[in-house]
UniProtKB/Swiss-Prot annotation:
This is Uridylate kinase. UMP binds at residues 46, 67, 115-121. ATP binds at residues 9-10, 47, 51, 141-142, 147, 150. The gene is pyrH. Signal peptide: none annotated. InterPro entries: AceGlu_kinase-like_sf (IPR036393), Asp/Glu/Uridylate_kinase (IPR001048), Uridylate_kinase (IPR011817), Uridylate_kinase_arch/spir (IPR011818). It comes from Methanococcus aeolicus (strain ATCC BAA-1280 / DSM 17508 / OCM 812 / Nankai-3). Pathway: Pyrimidine metabolism; CTP biosynthesis via de novo pathway; UDP from UMP (UMPK route): step 1/1.
Length: 225
């Protein structure tokens, strides 16, 4: 199976900072998936690293410049994961889909970050999944699925177990796309998912939950074309 992951930066790099054990856990999960004959691409978000830098830069620079800072943060996080993947990955972060596909064709795990200003890593992951004709897009984030409203702000938020790509568009249509924003799936990514008819799973990004997608025992939300 060919799978593209959008791995939230705040999942890989929480507020307390990088953890050797945590990075190793993620690397081991992706190695195991690769060993089971899956083709794996991972697009890593900027998370707290990006947001910290962007919050300062925004006092001096426009959103496009802040986007560039965010992209660099995603590539730093990508390099950290690459370092833990040993010879399962190429020691380089591809900056475009053509280079990502070359690495995938070398039978390696692809790890990359952002590519263009105003494109979140969710949008990059969705575009990459479309480009390589992936079987599945997995959005691994700090919320365990898609809700009718933000569960971090609303105690009465209800989790949606399954929905269509059209329904996803309705839910995400008004989300923010400022540099460093952290919505579950942003509007551009939702449009690409719908256009490409991508099967998408949104899960809480713990390593053990990521592994469960292979046997469909995860507790996330399934988005069908």
């Amino acid at each position: 199976m060919k799978i593209v992951f959008a791995l939230g930066g705040s999942v890989l790099m929480p507020k307390e900072g990088a953890s050797v054990d945590k990075i190793k856990e993620y690397a081991d999960v992706f190695k195991k998936m690769k060993d089971e004959n899956n083709e794996i691409c991972i697009v890593v978000g900027g998370g707290n690293t990006a947001r910290t830098y962007i919050s300062v830069a925004r006092e001096f620079a426009n959103e496009s410049f802040c986007d560039e800072i965010g992209i660099l943060a995603t590539r730093m996080n990508s390099m950290l994961l690459i370092s833990a993947l040993d010879n399962y990955a190429v020691k380089k972060v591809p900056e475009n889909f053509k280079d990502a596909e070359i690495i995938l064709n070398l039978n390696k795990i692809v790890v990359m970050g952002g590519t263009h200003p105003a494109h979140t890593t969710d949008a990059v992951a969705a575009s990459l999944a479309e480009y390589i004709d992936a079987d599945m897009l997995v959005v691994a984030t700090n919320v365990d699925g898609v809700y009718d409203k933000d569960p971090r702000k609303h105690a009465d938020a209800k989790k949606i177990k399954q929905l269509t790509t059209k329904e996803l568009l309705n839910i995400t249509g008004s989300a923010s796309i400022e540099a460093g924003s952290s919505t579950i799936i942003d509007p551009l990514a939702s449009k690409i998912i719908d256009r490409a008819k991508l099967k998408t799973i949104v899960i809480e990004g713990a390593p053990e939950e990521i592994l469960k997608i292979l046997n469909n025992t995860h507790s996330g939300t399934i988005i069908n074309p």
